[in-house]
Amino acid sequence: MIKAEQKVLKRFNKGCVDYHLLEDGDRILIALSGGKDSLELVRLLAQRARIFKPHIEVEAAHIIMDNIPYETDRSYLQDFCAENGIRLHILHSSFDESTDPRKTRCFLCAWNRRKTLFEFAVNNGFNKIALGHHMDDILVTLLMNITFEGSHSTMQPSLPLKHYPLTIVRPLCLVHEADIRQVAEELHFTKQKALCPYEETTRRSDMQAVFRQLEQLNPEARYSLWRSVFMA
């Protein structure tokens, strides 16, 4: 096992234990976008599902937005899941921009993706949805919320939903993006064919640069930021 794989596995296991993300009898649906993070989440949870305790069942769902002109390699995702012993569901969704012109395409797309995913999970007996956000995602969101909203908050490792009998879990919450990137390169994960043309990345990209600068100032900055939220 390569060093990056060992790091990712160790932090994945620690996150699952520290935040009680996996419990006996869980039926978990992975939101598979096709990016490196969700692919690695499929690989790790597939391995974890083969362990006797806690006994979990894992499947994945990939959502296609029919009215957004972007493309993912569906056959690759199907083959990847099959190789890992995971059943993949292909779901379709769309949205009508005219219903609320005040909302951006990205908001409407994300909202409808979540709704499609949640409803499928409930209707098919899943109790948890696993998302591929890693530690860097969570901390960049924290910095964005502090800077633009005045809110010391971010995505949680585990979050019960109010309107659905589901819990969102983020098993990669302690994993560093750099390690996932290295695993993806060494295991030859295939990237999406094309990204969404409407993706809003400027503000998040800017804050990612700020986060990198903080780590240059203090290599332990990520751990200080994490403690400020989750160990306060």
Predicted segments — roles?
Residues 1-143, 148, 178-186:
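ATP-dependent adenylation/nucleotidyltransferase module used to activate substrates
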Residues 65-67, 95-97, 159, 175, ...:
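Residue-level detector of flexible, active-site-proximal loop/helix-junction positions
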Residues 136-216:
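Catalytic subdomain that performs nucleotidyl-dependent activation
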Residues 48, 107-116, 149-154, 206-223:
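Short, structured secondary-structure boundary patches
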Residues 4, 8, 73, 176, ...:
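Alpha-helical structural motif
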Residues 220-232:
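A short, charged, Gly/Pro-tolerant segment at domain boundaries
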Residues 89-95, 121, 159-164, 200-204, ...:
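Short C-terminal domain-edge/linker segments immediately following a structured domain
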Residues 94-97, 131, 195-199, 221:
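Short, surface-exposed helix-loop/turn micro-motifs enriched in polar/charged residues
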